[in-house]
Amino acid sequence: IWGSILTTVFVVVMLFTNSYKKIERSIIAFVSVIGLSFIYELFLVKIDWSLAAQGWVTPSFPHGSMLIIMSVLGAVVMPHNLFLHSEVIQSHEYNKKDDASIRKVLKYELFDTLFSMIVGWAINSAMILLAAATFFKSGIQVEELQQAKSLLEPLLGNSAAVVFALALLMAGISSTITSGMAAGSIFAGIFGESYHIKDSHSQVGVILSLGIALLLIFFIGDPFKGLLISQMILSIQL
């Protein structure tokens, strides 16, 4: 719980004291750390790439796995980020540009959206591959995130467990930042305004979304299951 409180405070301060460009660079840095962390982890395990490719092309749906499947979909696509990308597009004030400039920027935003989804898919795939090559192969059932870190130590060593925890922390911070910005954008849009962190409506949207999410944590008995359900809700939003 204290970790959630500190993360929320850190994100609110970061959003309220930095420009969009600085926040964008910070998110790129966070995601880079996540990607490099899981690349490092994958080098420590033996992956059956033929089975992995088969799973990507012809996935199976075991009984009782629908919750996990939907949560992975929500974690990869993250519909609130689509709202955020829409806000970015509108903020360019296309009415002051010609059609060629508009098409160019729209193509860039399309590429940016697809690229972010591909990166999200790659990171989630890396997590699944890591779990398959360690926990599933060893017949270990993981029921909470802290257990996952602890179980990685005897399997891959202390450094792998620390890197895994660091990657999860960076993932939590980056997703909290984007969800807060998306909420601020949506709330400001209700009043016909664009997202700007100095605007009171944008600030209220950020505080409401992160504050409510933080309060819900106090009522969730099983954080691991709560995480799965929250990501499943994201997939339903699609």
List each model region and its residues.
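Small-residue-rich segments of transmembrane alpha-helices in multi-pass membrane proteins
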Residues: 30-42, 63-67, 205-211, 237-238
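Hydrophobic alpha-helical segments and their helix-loop junctions in multi-pass secondary transporters
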Residues: 32-58, 69-89
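Membrane-water interface regions at transmembrane-helix termini and the short interhelical loops
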Residues: 8-29, 41, 215-226
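Membrane-interface interhelical connector segments
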Residues: 138-161, 187, 191-195
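Extracellular/periplasmic helix-exit of transmembrane alpha-helices
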Residues: 89-93, 98, 118-147
